[in-house]
């Protein structure tokens, strides 16, 4: 079987490098005869690993999340904070879906990464119709939409002038020369009944409505605290391609204004806002990035083209080394594992980004990697490939880890070693004071940010800190982690294996992960 190397390399390293694996570690049992210092380190390692393991185990047990199929999107949905889109663009969203399938969506745009200075607002009206369950993204629902009207309102004179020039350069004569746009006045960018349309000036599209997922969960096991989240399709990282892109992943979720996390201050502010009163979020200071300690996924994450995973990163700031555990699954709630990847390398401290306000730039190098197939289909697929380009030929077994460093990675998974990526990070605190770590969003075209000019300008879903420091750089007990990870995965049923094989082949044919 031949799988295009270029396609593989586009998506596997993205999922790899800082995309995601991760179940927490097993507890270590120190030898009672060990040196006191070793006992102290072992005890600390056991504690931090128990914390990280507990947080990821919660995800792998379904995190008590209910997915609505088909989704009920009727209601008012709002952003939970200041979102960053590629460009960068800083935005908050407020979407209303009505029982007659119509919708009204506000997109509030800002001049900074804290969403404190609104510059313009789009008001989008249209109609949406849910279709079938997505055959590409499991757990998602496909939808069609039709736009009826789009209005734009500038919130200061300089922006009104700039937008007027942009629109007229794109659509000559769209705005009469004697009637330039003014501040706080609504103007049509699209009106269905008279054919008025110039959305391409802003590279605007609402294709996010083509992929939908609704999740429900009760926070802290409290039946009185229901939270509903609406996931809409991802936005292409190249603004010029947004009008032609069909989503294959998700944006950060919106929360139902009626059933939202009560600690979400931004939710309440955005809920009360409109085009004449855009939301102004509370100002926050940018946190200094400190890459140390351990960080894990907060949810089962979705990557383009049938890739579901969780991540666990370990940073050793004493010597600038890092480790990443990436656990991949065939399902959107991360219950059925397919393979794991353990990677490690070095990172260099960068500088504050001149392009993305609030971001800090890093360079990551990967020089060591291990792979573990977690189901029969994946092991079989790895054994199909000829030559020693992914571990020892024909030697792959379910649950048995192999070091692929000596074969310069794994061509079957699209991984080449050594590999360098140019990253961007930011750090925030949630309403409960917990630290969140964001790293760069993978390019939508599947390429790798292997040059400075390809560095991301937006972010992935955040990781949450599960251990604040790491005593010293050492390889964590991967065998124990894999045993825990695989203990709940009955991957030998023929039907499950067949499905996993199809999913794996479809995914691998589009990956290009550490290229």
From Swiss-Prot:
Residues 1-26 form the signal peptide. The chain crosses the membrane at residues 491-508. One of its GO terms (cellular component) is plasma membrane. InterPro entries: APCDD1, APCDD1_dom. GO terms for molecular function: Wnt-protein binding. The keyword Amino-acid biosynthesis does not apply. Residues 27-490 are extracellular. Keywords: Cell membrane, Glycoprotein, Membrane, Signal, Transmembrane, Wnt signaling pathway. Glycans are attached at residues 100, 168, 319. GO terms for biological process: negative regulation of Wnt signaling pathway; Wnt signaling pathway. The keyword Cytoplasm does not apply. It is found in: Cell membrane. It comes from the Eukaryota. Negative regulator of the Wnt signaling pathway. Inhibits Wnt signaling in a cell-autonomous manner and functions upstream of beta-catenin. Belongs to the APCDD1 family. This is Protein APCDD1. The gene is APCDD1.
